[in-house]
Regions:
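ATP-binding N-lobe of GHMP and related small-molecule kinases
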Residues: 1-111, 131, 135-140, 177, ...
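ATP-dependent small-molecule kinase catalytic core of the GHMP/sugar-kinase superfamily
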Residues: 2-6, 13-29, 132-252, 265-295
Length: 295
């Protein structure tokens, strides 16, 4: 049995640079990952099976996981389109060799939250099965498979700190300044990425330019062009940010991705934990964590 982390994804800034002829938005964004996330456990099995547990196991829709349990050998195939099992199917179709697996997904990341939960889960699956495989895929093949599963899956597969460009197909590693602790919070209201990107209130700030010399707060200050649209769709995001910004020891706060999760950076973990407690009292989901550093 092996267990792997699927870390939550944070967009420290996100700027919309325009749309291409296909209607895809081109972005400039800096992405990091946290020590908090979902967890996938793998055990050998005669047939593939998926069990979903955790706080948000029942909140998943057809875009990710739609049943608490999925087994290919049963007539209940409502989970056939979930991203974890699609990643496993895609791995085999690409030539990877892996025997049957019983997979347990502990779903800790809120759904529809702008934290990349489904993409992180798919990327964690690909990393794990490639390590277990008798005939692992080359990194380029694995990347192409990740890209076929969704725009955020390649960066979740790469991990670390990455500056992304275009529709997510351009990736450049970036050395993240010291950040201290990070607080994540969510109003417990799912927000559709499609609804945000098609809303008339998104901004088009363009490429941020050089990031040299910017500290963590300076990077966050480059902004999130999706925030105005998300605030219209889920006004509770504003209250979340206001509570964060009023807490002791905060360096900066912003919305992550397409929302509705927000994050804040703190020097001290104790301050982040105190802020999380305040948000929970106000009815928000919240957790204090650290930026995940790649060895």
């Amino acid at each position: 049995m092996i267990s792997v982390l699927a870390p939550a994804k944070i967009n420290l800034f996100l700027r919309v640079c325009g749309k291409d002829d296909r209607g895809y938005h081109h972005l400039d964004s800096l992405i990091v990952f946290t020590e908090f996330g979902d967890r996938l456990t793998f055990e050998p099995a005669a047939d593939d099976a998926l069990i979903v547990t955790g706080e948000f196991s029942t909140a998943l829709d057809s875009a990710e996981i739609v049943t608490p349990r999925f087994n290919r050998q049963t007539q209940d195939n409502r989970g056939a389109d979930n991203l974890v099992m699609r990643a496993l199917d895609g791995y085999r179709e690409a030539g990877g060799v892996i025997d049957g697996l019983a997979i347990t997904l502990e779903k800790n990341i809120p759904v529809g939250a702008g934290l990349g939960g489904g993409s992180a889960d798919a990327a964690a699956l690909l990393r794990a099965v490639n390590a277990l495989s008798r005939a692992p895929l080359d990194s380029s093949v694995l990347y192409d498979l990740a890209a076929s599963l969704g725009a955020d899956v390649p960066v979740c597969l790469a991990g670390g700190c990455q500056r992304i460009a275009g529709i997510g197909d351009g990736m450049t590693p970036f050395t993240m300044p010291q950040t201290g602790a990070i607080l994540l919070a969510n109003p417990r209201i799912p927000l559709s990425t499609r609804d945000v990107f098609t809303h008339s209130d998104i901004r088009y700030s363009g490429v941020a330019g050089s990031l040299d010399g910017l500290d963590a707060a300076g990077l966050v200050a480059l902004g999130n062009d999706l925030t105005p649209a998300a605030l219209v769709l889920v006004p509770q995001i504003r209250s979340c940010l206001e509570i964060m910004e009023a807490t002791s020891g905060i360096k900066c706060a912003a919305m992550s991705g397409s929302g509705g999760s927000c994050f804040a950076l703190f020097e001290q973990t104790s301050d982040a934990k105190a802020a999380a407690a305040q948000l929970e009292i106000a009815g928000y989901w919240a957790i204090a964590s650290q930026i995940y550093q790649v060895d």
